Amino acid sequence: MSSDAVDETHENARQEVIAVDADDNEEGLVNRLDAHTGDGVRHRAFTALLFDENDRILLAQRAANKRLWDTHWDGTVASHPVEGQTQVEATEERLEEELGVDPSQYQNLRVTDRFEYKRYYENAGLEWEVCAVLQATLHDTSLEPNPEEVDGLMWVPYERLREHPEYYRQLRLCPWFEIAMRRDEER
């Protein structure tokens, strides 16, 4: 399905993402809506996991206006870098846009993993991403969430969540976050 067959007024119809092969090598740009509808197009993405000094992870509830996985709970932020932008630069930008968190509030933002996945969401579309995982520790937990992006925030003991995800099923976790958490060897 092309973006012509989807609501072209949606903001995603005016954005591009980076199409990649299975090894995360760039293959060009693709319309963001096309990448997330029909059979989709594999593209570059990231999810960032921020922790406090007590090893709690900051989960963010995706806003109800999101096309995919609306109101689901995610790792701290997730998005797509734009052409010419590193994963770290893209993450710094999203942290500031979504949560009002600037680089002076955290340390050691780094890529810790990368994986490919493909998941469909209801009848709304899909994610087919090579997803980088970034992690950092917040030493200043002051937050100013953007209500257009985030409906809620929650600090959760990370090891408890990793070891007993069944305790948190009512949160409806985003699939990319669940994969990143299962694969996490950093903590």
UniProtKB/Swiss-Prot annotation:
It comes from the Archaea. Mg(2+) binds at residue 98. Mn(2+) binds at residues 36, 43, 80, 127, 129. Binds 1 Mg(2+) ion per subunit. The magnesium ion binds only when substrate is bound. Pathway: Isoprenoid biosynthesis; dimethylallyl diphosphate biosynthesis; dimethylallyl diphosphate from isopentenyl diphosphate: step 1/1. One of its GO terms (molecular function) is isopentenyl-diphosphate delta-isomerase activity. It is an enzyme of class 5 (isomerase). It is found in: Cytoplasm. Coiled coil: none annotated. Catalyzes the 1,3-allylic rearrangement of the homoallylic substrate isopentenyl (IPP) to its highly electrophilic allylic isomer, dimethylallyl diphosphate (DMAPP). Belongs to the IPP isomerase type 1 family. This is Isopentenyl-diphosphate Delta-isomerase. It comes from Haloarcula marismortui (strain ATCC 43049 / DSM 3752 / JCM 8966 / VKM B-1809).
